Amino acid sequence: MKQSTNIANRLREVLLNGHWIANTNCKEQLQLVTWRQAIHKVGNLNTIAALTFHLNYYLSGVLNAFNTGKLEIKDQYSFDMPPVENETNWQKLTDDFLRNAEMFAAKVEEISDEQLQEAFIDEKYGTNLRNVEGMIEHCYYHLGQISLIRKLIANI
């Protein structure tokens, strides 16, 4: 199996369909959340909607970078989410996230093993492989947060 296929499968596992590492995945967790739960604030934690937006921001931005060779996202904007005021807004956010998750995994699967070792946009960002592995770790980190917040607000 190509390394990129293996990594794409790991992305799909955390984002869309896996249970091996965390016994859940982002898609599964988000489908259990109502829009009111998604925007419910617990202390100083981010909301589930904000975390979903944040993950989608990076998936979309890095996917765009892979497609265009230009990195056009900035960390400072990664939580600049438009208001989620109803179920339609929440559904659009989750649909966009899930679509970008699959497109990102599909794009990674297309990358050759040689390209995985090449610089991601600029050498200062490391290799394509390092950035995809970082995305996987980033997604697991926020999946854990989403899962815990969902448990804290289960009765809302």
Model-predicted regions and their roles:
Residues V84-E118, R130-M135:
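Acidic/histidine-rich alpha-helical segments that form the ligand environment
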Residues K2-T5, L11-L30, W35-D80, I121-I156:
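Short, contiguous alpha-helical
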